[in-house]
C-alpha cells in the first residue's frame, strides 16, 4: 500500500465526525491483535494545554532513555505529526504498512469505524511495532467515550486545564465537562491535575475517591517565575529550577503538571533522573503555541481556538510586547465562540486582517471582517491565510508585531509558508 492509498483509507471512511462510544475501536483493535495491551501509557485529557503538556512529558521521558511514543491531534502541517516516536513523525512507508493491516479488519466490521478511531488504531499498532516503552496519549475529544480510552489503566492519567469547549458534545457546565474528561481515570492508575476551578476540583476529588485513585494536584503557589523573555523562561517548582523555551505563564502551570506526573511515575518505580527532567523541559518544542516565527517585524503564531486561549494570547502580547503596534491576523471556525475570543483579543489590537482557515467549518473571511468592524479599528480581508501573513509582513514596520490567532487549521498553513519562505531566502 502506498502512502496515498493509506491516506485515502483513513479519510475515505463514512463517518468523518465524532461518534462517541468504544465498541467500534475495541472491535478494530481486537481484530488487530490488541496492540494497546502490550503498551504503557500516560493518558492526557483536558480543554487546554493537552498538547503542550504531552510534548513536555514525551521530551522528559525520551531524555530519561525511554523509547517514547507521542499521539496528539490535530496536526499542523503534516498528518504524520500526529504519531511520533522519540520526536520523529511516522515515516510514510511505516504508516502505509499499518494501514494495510487495518484494511481487512475494517472490511470485516458491520459498523465501520470513524476516522479518529482508525488513526488511533493505526497509532497503537505502530507504537507496538516500534517497541515503545511508553506512549504519551492525548485524548481526541472529551475522555470517557474517546477512542483513546480503549486502553486499560494507564501508568498515569493527567487532567490539564478544564474550560468550556465542545459544549454541544461534552455538556455546557464545567462540572459536566469535568465528568467527561475524568472518564480516563481508571482504578489502578495515579492521577495528576492542573490547578482547577473549585467545581472541577470537586468532581476530580469525588471520582478519584470513588475509584481509589491517588490524586496529585499542582500547587500553583509553588511555581516561582525567575526570568522571562521572548526566548523562553526560567522558574522554580517546589524549590527546583528549570528552563522552558515555551512562552507564557500558563506554560509554567503546564510544566508543573508534567513535573507532578514525573513524581507520580517515580512512585510507580519509573527511573527518571533529575537531569533528564531538566533536559526534557529545556529541549521541548511545541509549535503554534505563542510561537515566535520572525523578528523585525515580530510574527507570533498561536493556534488557540476558544475564549480561554484567546485571553492567554492577549495576556502574552501585553507581557512580551508592551507599547508596540499589534496587528491581529484572525481566522476562526464558525462553530467556536469567536465573539468571546475576539473580545479578549481586541484589548491588544491596533488593526485586523481577517482570513479563512483551511476547514469546511471555517467562518468566511468576509463575514469575519464584517464582525470585526464593530471594534472600530482598521480591518483588511484576505481569505488565504498564507497570503494574509505576507500582506501583514509587507505593511509592518520592523518594531511592529503581527499575531496570527484563532485556529490550528490556519496556523499550519501560515507556518508552512513562512518557514518555506525563510528557507528559500537563507539558501537552506
What kind of feature is each model-predicted range?
Residues 131-133, 323, 397-399:
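Short, high-confidence coil segments that cap the C-terminus of an alpha-helix
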Residues 18, 22, 26-37, 63-152, ...:
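ATP-dependent carboxylate-amine ligase catalytic core
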Residues 194-216, 230-232, 298-299, 307, ...:
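C-terminal helical cap/extension that packs against the catalytic core
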Residues 407:
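Active-site-proximal loop/hinge segments that shape catalytic or ion-binding/gating pockets
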